[in-house]
Regions:
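Short, Lys/Arg-rich flexible segments
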Residues: 1-156
Length: 156
């Protein structure tokens, strides 16, 4: 008396999906980093323009009475011609790093003066992020990567 068993395996399907995933993974990482850079850019611009807050979520030092009267506004949002904040961009600089920067040298100098308080300007640190923002961007990055990995359905 003998027993026989026939085993069917899905190893070929899993193997092909795994190979596809390995080839696609560097691109997924780049997409995630690009998205993280864009997230940081959006956070900096929105926090500065819409809410009038610095990188530590504190209100900016107010405009001088003369400037308030001249421009007719009291909320500090670092908007005069709207060029400085519109000049902020993001790009991938390596396979592990995204960078948020000013596309225009002129606007970068203007931002540096606001950031450091050069000349008659008070210090208004808007171009940066705190630990809370860092954690938020990290979570968004992780969520994006996990979502992309799940699309491959490696384990059938």
């Amino acid at each position: 008396m003998a027993l026989s068993i026939k085993v069917q395996s899905n190893i070929k399907i899993v193997q092909s999906k795994y190979i596809k995933f390995i080839n696609k993974f560097p691109q997924i990482i780049k997409m995630g980093l690009d998205q993280a850079g864009e997230n940081l850019k959006t956070i900096v611009v929105d926090r500065t323009h819409k809410r009038g807050l610095d990188m530590n979520n504190r209100k900016f030092i107010g405009y001088s009475p003369y400037y308030q009267e001249l421009k007719g506004k009291t909320k500090v949002d670092l908007q005069d011609t709207n060029r400085m904040l519109q000049s902020i961009g993001s790009k991938l600089v390596s396979s592990t790093k995204a960078q948020v920067f000013f596309r225009s040298q002129r606007e970068a100098i203007k931002a540096f003066r606001h950031q450091t308080g050069q000349g008659k300007l008070p210090v208004r640190k808007f171009f940066g992020f705190n630990k809370k923002v860092e954690k938020l961007i990290g979570k968004n990055y992780e969520r994006f990567i996990n979502k992309q990995i799940k699309k491959f359905k490696i384990w059938v």
